[in-house]
A protein has these predicted regions:
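Extreme N-terminal starter segment of soluble prokaryotic enzymes
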Residues: 1-2
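Glycine-rich beta-strand-centered segment in the early N-terminal region that forms part
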Residues: 23-40, 52-94
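NAD(P)H dinucleotide-binding glycine-rich loop of Rossmann-like/cofactor-binding domains
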Residues: 86-125
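Short polar catalytic/cofactor-binding loops
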Residues: 7-12, 39-41
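Conserved hydrophobic/aromatic beta-strand scaffold that supports enzyme active sites
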Residues: 19, 24, 68-70, 99-101, ...
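Short gly/ser/thr-rich secondary-structure transition/capping motifs
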Residues: 13-21, 52-53
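Cytochrome P450 core scaffold surrounding the K-helix E-X-X-R motif
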Residues: 44-50
């Protein structure tokens, strides 16, 4: 598993972000594990890497403000989603990863469609 992490910000986004190994725990109660299918690069992502966006996550951080994925595993007490379901990821959750765990109640179920198109439903630059 991989994540696109940055430890600092700078004027050249490609110089501050790197693919690094991701260790992911099993989903906790109320969470699901998601395989990320598509996560676009928008102006808001670039401005976050350069430090020019209005809201900046604490460092180190994982890039990506929007995306879509497929549920791979359910934590205890999850009844609103099922394995194999496509979902819209929470805005700003660090979507430039191969997999992530997210709160099931923050995910939006999606119909089966092109993940690249669905991945761009939430963020405006």
């Amino acid at each position: 598993m991989l994540k696109a992490e940055y430890q600092h910000r700078g004027p050249q986004p490609h110089e501050v972000i790197a693919a690094v190994a991701l260790q992911l725990a099993e989903p906790a109660a109320g969470q699901v594990r998601i395989k990320v299918l598509a996560a676009p690069i928008n102006p808001s992502d670039v401005l976050t890497l350069t430090g020019e966006y209005g809201m900046l996550p604490p460092l180190p951080a994982i890039g990506g403000n929007e995306g879509v994925g497929r549920v791979e595993a359910l934590g205890a007490e999850v009844s609103n989603l099922k394995v194999g379901q496509m979902v819209l990821l929470p805005v700003g959750c660090g979507t430039w990863v191969s997999h992530l765990n997210a709160a099931a109640n923050k995910l939006i179920p999606l119909p089966e469609a092109d993940p690249q198109q669905l991945a761009m439903l939430t963020v405006n630059p």
